[in-house]
Amino acid sequence: FLRNTDSSSTYYGRYFLISDNNQTRVTLDLSRVAQSETSYGANTFFPAGTTIEVVPAPTLGSVFGRDTTDLPTNWTYGLSENSDWIYLWDSTVKNYFPFFFLGTTYEASGWPRGWYDSLDYSSGVLSNKVIYPDEAFIVAKRTSGTVNFEFEGTIQTNDQELFLPEGGNQVLM
């Protein structure tokens, strides 16, 4: 992600996914901007002289584990119907979708270990699926026992611009 760190900017704190880059340019994914901002280019959010920070994008794998030994304590993995799930928000269809972790049992059958879409196994391993900042995830502990999570990282403690979705693009739970 590219984050605006210029405290004098109207867009201070806003994140944008880096979709491509090389030595001289960065391409940002602006598909998730507000309806009122769709005509804006990256230079609106980051005019010349704006201070920025490049932040690694959190993914299903980097947050919840890339291998069975990385998973939260007491997390149940395996086939979708017998495992615990993480729900992630899909802003395209405005709904949460479940993901499960498939361990090593099915690797010989061509199913590598990793995170899969519970509703569409054919999508393949989705361990690199991005979890956007300020978007919630839901933990569904569908098996017995208590799961324990440990997260590492930093939390912003200064005031930032909060992006609220336009009407009709939110869910109350």
Task: Please identify what each model-predicted range represents.
Residues 28-30, 124-127, 170-173:
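Exposed aromatic-hydrophobic patches
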Residues 47-94, 143-173:
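Catalytic cores of histone-lysine modification enzymes
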Residues 44, 129-130, 162:
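Residue "hotspots" at secondary-structure boundaries inside conserved domains
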Residues 1-57:
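Ser/Thr/Gly-rich low-complexity blocks that favor extended beta-strand/coil architectures
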Residues 98-154:
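Charged, amphipathic alpha-helical scaffolding segments
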Residues 13-15, 20-23, 49, 81-84, ...:
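Extracellular structured ligand-interaction cores
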Residues 3-7, 87-91, 140:
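A generic structural motif
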Residues 15-19, 93-105:
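Short amphipathic beta-strand/extended segments with alternating polar/hydrophobic composition
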